[in-house]
C-alpha cells in the first residue's frame, strides 16, 4: 500500500516539469523528523506499550500509550511548525546550489510545508498500530491503509488539474490523517487502552501553544537573518542560529506553559531501560 501511495504521487509529478525533484527533496526533509521521532518512541516507549497490552494490563497499557503519545507530540508539533513557518530557509540552505535555483527552492518549500502538516498524523499512526498488533489484529490496519490509499488517489488526481504538482503532497497529507482517524476509530473497541487521558489532553494543548510561540520567534529570526542566508559562506551558520533559537524558545515556552515535565521524561527513559 505504501508503494502504491508513492506511485500515485510520482504519476502526478510526471505531468509537471521539475515536480519529481521538488517532491523528492520535500519528502526527504519531512522524513527526517519522522524518522527521528519514530526511532525515539520505538526505542523508548513502544516496547513497554506492546508488552503491557499483550499481558492484558489495560491500566498500564493506557498509561504507556498516553505517555508515548505525549512524547510524540512534544517532539513532532514543533517540527511541524518549523516545516510550515521556515521551509524556504531550510530548502535554500540545504539544496539551493548548482542547477537547483531559487524557483526550485520556492516549489520545494511549498511541498515541504504541505508534507509537514501531515507529520503528526504519520507519527501517531506508529502509536495506534501496536494496539491492534498486540491483539493479533493485522487486518484492520491493512483495511485502513486501503482507505488512505483511496483518499490519496482521489485528492491527488482530483486536485492536480487545479493546483498542479502540490496535489500529490496534499494527497499524501490527507491520506495520513485519514489513516489516523481510521486507527483512532477502530481502536475504540479496545476500551481504555488507546484513549487519551486528562494529562495528555491538557499537555497536547500546551505543546501546541509552546510550538506556536516558537514559530513566531523563528519566523522573526529567519526574517532578520534573511541576508545571511543568501551568503554562501554563512548560510549554514545562519540556519544553525535559527534552529538554535527554535530549540531554546520552544524549551522556554514549554517550561513556562507546563507542556512537559523533565522528571517524567527521565522516568520514561528509565522505564525503557
Specify the residue positions occupied by each region the protein language model found.
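Membrane-embedded alpha-helical bundles of multi-pass transporters/translocases
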Residues: 1-273
Amino acid at each position: 500500500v505504501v508503494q502504491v501511495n508513492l506511485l500515485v504521487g510520482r504519476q502526478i509529478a510526471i505531468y509537471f516539469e521539475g515536480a519529481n525533484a521538488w517532491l523528492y527533496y520535500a519528502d526527504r526533509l519531512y522524513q527526517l523528523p519522522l524518522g527521528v521521532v519514530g526511532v525515539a518512541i520505538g526505542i523508548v516507549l513502544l516496547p513497554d506499550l506492546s508488552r503491557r497490552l499483550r499481558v492484558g494490563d489495560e491500566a498500564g497499557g493506557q498509561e504507556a500509550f498516553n505517555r508515548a503519545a505525549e512524547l510524540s507530540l512534544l517532539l513532532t508539533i514543533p517540527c511541524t511548525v518549523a516545516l510550515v513557518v521556515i521551509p524556504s530557509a531550510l530548502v535554500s540552505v540545504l539544496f539551493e546550489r548548482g542547477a537547483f535555483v531559487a524557483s526550485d527552492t520556492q516549489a520545494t518549500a511549498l511541498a515541504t510545508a504541505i508534507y509537514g502538516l501531515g507529520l503528526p498524523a504519520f507519527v501517531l499512526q506508529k502509536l495506534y498500530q501496536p494496539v491492534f498488533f498486540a491483539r493479533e489484529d493485522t487486518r484492520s490496519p491493512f483495511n485502513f491503509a486501503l482507505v488512505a490509499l483511496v483518499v490519496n488517489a482521489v485528492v491527488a488526481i482530483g486536485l492536480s488539474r487545479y493546483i498542479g504538482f502540490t496535489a500529490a503532497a496534499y494527497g499524501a497529507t490527507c491520506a495520513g490523517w485519514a489513516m489516523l482517524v481510521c486507527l483512532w476509530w477502530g481502536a475504540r473497541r479496545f476500551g481504555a487502552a488507546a484513549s487519551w487521558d486528562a494529562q495528555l489532553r491538557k499537555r497536547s494543548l500546551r505543546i501546541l501553544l509552546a510550538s506556536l510561540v516558537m514559530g513566531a520567534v523563528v519566523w522573526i529570526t529567519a526574517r532578520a537573518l534573511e541576508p545571511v542566508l543568501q551568503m554562501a559562506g554563512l548560510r549554514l551558520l545562519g540556519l544553525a542560529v535559527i534552529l538554535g533559537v527554535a530549540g531554546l524558545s520552544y524549551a522556554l515556552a514549554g517550561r513556562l506553559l507546563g507542556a512537559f515535565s523533565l522528571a517524567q521524561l527521565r522516568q520514561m527513559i528509565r522505564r525503557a531501560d
